[in-house]
UniProtKB/Swiss-Prot annotation:
Reported function: Converts 2-succinyl-6-hydroxy-2,4-cyclohexadiene-1-carboxylate (SHCHC) to 2-succinylbenzoate (OSB). Also acts as a N-succinylamino acid racemase (NSAR) that catalyzes the racemization of N-succinyl-L-phenylglycine. Since the gene is encoded in a menaquinone synthesis operon, OSB synthase is probably the physiological activity. A pathway that requires NSAR activity has not been identified in this species, so whether NSAR is also a biological activity is unknown.
Name the record gives this protein: o-succinylbenzoate synthase
Family of this protein: Belongs to the mandelate racemase/muconate lactonizing enzyme family. MenC type 2 subfamily.
Keyword annotations: Isomerase, Lyase, Magnesium, Menaquinone biosynthesis, Metal-binding
Highest taxon of the lineage: Bacteria
Cofactor: a divalent metal cation
Residues engaged in binding Mg(2+): D189, E214, D239
Substrates-to-products reaction catalysed: (1R,6R)-6-hydroxy-2-succinyl-cyclohexa-2,4-diene-1-carboxylate = 2-succinylbenzoate + H2O
Gene name of the record: menC
E.C. number: 4.2.1.113, 5.1.1.-
Organism: Enterococcus faecalis (strain ATCC 700802 / V583)
Length: 367
């Protein structure tokens, strides 16, 4: 394929309600949409989902914009691309910056599938048309209000609830939820809020039949996670420190976890994500798909990727209305009896809403 143009929309979508984690508060989701057009007029869409603050991982929206325009796009234009798997090799000389790489790499995958007149799901092997999904709930100090949120999620049919926790907000809300919902698939996510000194408190969580405890310790730690996993019956899940297949291999070798939260942007794109999914399946690591408050473009990709049979555990792929009043695609994603339908159109299978793009974004033609 020959790239004819690259455009970007800098988008800001307000959230319906603020989302609070152990490291911050999110009131709107800022992201960039990249549109890559080939010589045939096909367009591939990729979403740059890095947050504005470096409080989740190192990348930010501003740093990745710079890396994309000054380094990755020039590399992408050095030669004609035949297969989307080539992109990760082309980008190898740039160290790190996985989310910037993923924004362009996923756009190339979408473009490639459209050139082949195929859905992107056809490149993922056997897939399902509908997949079970879960919901993530932010820190809610008002515990009666938290119970209402859980009740609403259950009534809507979400098949798993994840609760964000931090020191001082952990055992009490978990115990309350478990008291009212004894059979609910429930997990917690600490976003690196704890240290090994908090072991006694984390051991208390072992009594509530949690599906897993996600990322209790630092994003660069494997050793303390391994010690914690030896101490707990509950499965430990790693998120922030899984940036590559090599990180999964290290985690397995050390016994740092028994589950992986896989986020396509966090590992540099689809090619690396496919290798990680295969590795987890081969080594009995429970792998599931996480989210980054994506718009409909990233959400479509997540649904397609999670349609692989490997992803049996419900991921963080909520309905559009969970977070946003409006989206940048024409058809919102809807929850139906705890499942969501995987888009089957060409590429990622969604159409952009030009009206909403004009309403919520600033346009820039890069080339």
């Amino acid at each position: 394929m020959n790239i004819q143009s690259i455009e970007t929309y800098q988008v800001r979508l307000p959230l319906k309600t603020p989302f609070v984690t152990s490291y911050g508060r999110l009131e709107e989701k800022a992201f960039d949409l990249f549109v890559i057009t080939d010589e045939q007029g096909n367009q591939g869409f990729g979403e740059l989902v890095a947050f504005e603050q470096p409080d989740y991982v190192q990348e930010t929206l501003v740093t990745e914009r710079f890396i994309i325009q000054q380094h990755l796009i020039p590399l992408l234009l050095t030669e004609a691309i035949e297969q989307p798997q080539e992109v990760s090799t082309i980008f190898e000389e740039v160290k790190g910056h996985w989310m910037g790489k993923a924004a362009l790499e996923t756009a190339i995958w979408d473009l490639y599938a459209k050139r082949q007149q195929k859905s992107l799901t056809e490149f993922f092997g056997p897939t399902r048309r509908k997949i079970p999904v879960g919901i993530s709930l932010g820190i809610q100090e008002d515990l009666p209000q938290l119970l209402k949120q859980v009740q609403l999620a259950v009534e809507k049919g979400y098949q798993r609830v994840k609760l964000k926790i931090r020191p001082g907000y952990d055992v009490e809300p978990v115990a309350l939820i478990r008291q009212h919902f004894p059979n609910l698939p429930l997990m917690v996510d600490a976003n690196s809020a704890y240290t090994l000194a908090d072991l006694p408190q984390l051991q208390r969580l072992d009594h509530y039949q949690l599906a897993m405890i996600e990322q209790p310790f630092a994003a660069d730690d494997f050793l303390d996670h391994a010690q914690l996993q030896r101490e707990l019956k509950t499965r430990i899940c790693l998120d922030e420190n899984i940036r590559s297949l090599k990180d999964c291999q290290v985690a397995l070798a050390l016994g740092s976890c028994r589950s992986i939260n896989l986020k396509i942007p966090r590992v540099g794109g689809i090619h690396e994500a496919l290798k990680i999914a295969a590795f987890c399946q081969e080594n009995d690591l429970l792998v599931w798909l996480g989210g980054m408050f994506e718009s409909g473009v990233g959400r479509a990709l997540n649904l397609q990727f999670a349609s692989q049979p490997t992803f049996s555990f419900p991921g963080d792929i909520s309905a559009t209305e969970r977070y946003f009043y409006e989206d940048i695609i024409t058809e919102p994603f809807i929850l139906e009896q705890g499942t969501m339908t995987v888009p089957q159109g060409l590429g990622i299978g969604v159409t952009l809403s030009q009206t909403n793009l004009l309403k919520y974004s600033q346009y820039q033609k890069i080339m």
